[in-house]
Amino acid sequence: RVIGVDVVPPRGDIGDVSFVRADIRSPVIAKVIAREQVDTVVHMSVIATPGKSGGRNAMKELNVIGTMQLLAACQKVDTVKHLVVKSTTTVYGASSRDPAMFTEDMGPKSVPRSGYAQDAYEIEGYVRGFARRRPDVRVTMLRCANVMGPHVASPMTSYFRMPIVPTVLGYDPRVQFLHEDDL
């Protein structure tokens, strides 16, 4: 059985998925996890742009505080055996001194100091703490790159949809993208 939780109802048919309308920061989440004896929690509600959440403070509250509330709910319920958390490759940073490829053992050259990258870095720290406190729960962290596709609206997709894409002559940055169908 699959239960979807969000503040926004689904746009279309979601088949056999049960839907609960709730904010990630609400105690309702803990009640749903306990009542339904949830064994796997998939946390995908990390917001990357402040405009979608009502500004930077609201974004941080949803991302970091919301994740902390979810982890606290998972900690209390012994039926939870697997936690999947969506993160981002931005936690690695974008230094010109960075290697072309990162491994899971590598960290950023410097800690992100603002925005989405900082939120993701903090969230990953809280998730690692949860994993130490609940070694019986298998934790999976998905570090996704920028999502692109015909149905994605973001500053990056707007940039690439321009009739002429401005670039800096002689600058060829490394970029990674994830197609929306792969997320």
Positions of the model-derived regions?
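Conserved glycine-rich Rossmann-like NAD(P)H-binding loop of the short-chain dehydrogenase/reductase
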Residues: 2-11
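Cofactor-binding loops of NAD(P)H-dependent oxidoreductases
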Residues: 5, 20-22
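NAD(P)H-binding glycine-rich loop region in Rossmannoid oxidoreductase-like domains
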Residues: 11, 24-65, 73-76, 94
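Conserved cofactor-binding/catalytic machinery of classical short-chain dehydrogenase/reductase
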Residues: 40, 65-69, 108, 122-123, ...
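Conserved Rossmann-fold NAD(P)-dependent oxidoreductase catalytic core, especially the SDR/UDP-sugar
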Residues: 68-116
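Active-site Tyr-X1-5-Lys
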Residues: 111-140
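NAD(P)-dependent short-chain dehydrogenase/reductase
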Residues: 130-182
